């Protein structure tokens, strides 16, 4: 295999603990909107709904604005809350998502260790308002070389169109010299395969992968990315 010259990092669930940010943001918004207590059971219910809506986006069934509001509309209807509050709730939620910054284990150390050795980019399907705040508050916007947010790019992972500006920006680095690291099989790994990029599935939970998806690497600890990069240079 070719030497890895660029690492493309997914953000939510790979570099940053999305579930921690999600939990804090929802609880804050429930309080701000006077919706009462948001229990852990309610957050788990919302999280499952949210995953389904994002997967529908990846399949091209809805637009980004539709899924952002639709997930809360469905959740509120299921909880007996007026769904009409969903648009305003989502707008505040996007702002609050960047309030809580928790790095996934060894993510910060790995990004720091790779600085100057390979090009490092964020490749994320999140919204611009949420991701800009997260990247700034975490310091990742100053550690990574380039940032690619689907809302700005105009395409979502796993679409090959998402990666077109990534390739253009990285110039002489070939797709096979890039490694995409992410926790999502449907957006990160499928996206990397679609674009001809080497793939690394971050799988800390030890989940089974579907046989039709053949990723190049599977890791349980982000620190393993450093080993993969070093091994490729030998």
Predicted regions and their residues:
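Structured helix-beta-strand junction loops
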Residues: 49, 116-117
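Glycine-centered loop/turn motif at secondary-structure junctions
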Residues: 34, 80, 117-118, 139, ...
